[in-house]
Amino acid sequence: MAPPRKHETDVILDAARALVLAGGPRAASVAAIATSSGAPAGTLYHRFGNRDGILAAAWLRALERFQARAMAAEADTPAETAVAMAVAGINFARKLPQDARLLLTIRPADLLDGEPDASFQKTLAAMNAPLIKRIRAFARQLYGSSDARCVDAVARAVSDLPYAVVRRHAHDEPMPSWLEADVAASARAVLERFGERP
């Protein structure tokens, strides 16, 4: 059995995230991450390969945390499950505000030294696939079709709406207590109104 790691990955990724949020992507050098996390630079290079590897891991961890909450959303009907998925975005931002800020304010292309490589793109596509599949399933269940327009309507309610709300309130400490209820009502209205179209 391997010995436990002396420097926990989450501590390293938290340090990288904090540096990026405080000073932008350039503030998160390997040396700065090493100093902030207490992990030797050699450990960082061994575990992540380079600075881009650390920052990509921090960003993907935030995305994974968001998606875990979104995919866990459940309710009695497809429409209410879609609404719960929208509200999950607000809950994520409330529980993990630094991760939400990282996802909202920093694009991978801005975070990394170059464009995200093929491996990053492949990982991102694989991570997004279940969410996209679920949105398509909602479109079929709610509107009887998974054509582009129906999928877009569901995406507006469960993804675009909470994204815009969280973006507006991401730096509020604390976020307003009424956000979940308002996002639920708004998402429900978008889904219902699209279902009533001629």
Placement of each model-derived feature along the sequence:
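N-terminal intrinsically disordered/low-complexity leader segments
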Residues: M1-H7, A18, G195-P198
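Helix-turn-helix
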Residues: V11, A15, L19-G53, A57
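Short hydrophobic clusters on alpha-helical segments that form packing/core surfaces
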Residues: I12-V20, A62, F66, G89, ...
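Short, charged helix-capping/linker segments at alpha-helix termini
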Residues: R26-A27, R51, G144-V151
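Hydrophobic alpha-helical connector segments
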Residues: A57, M71-Q98, A155-V158
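Amphipathic alpha-helical packing segments from all-alpha helical-bundle domains
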Residues: Q67, L102, L111-G144, D152-R156, ...
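Secondary-structure edge/capping motif, primarily at the C-terminal ends of alpha-helices
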Residues: A70-E74, L104-L111, L142, V165, ...
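Amphipathic C-terminal alpha-helical segment
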Residues: K95, A137, Q141, A155-S177, ...
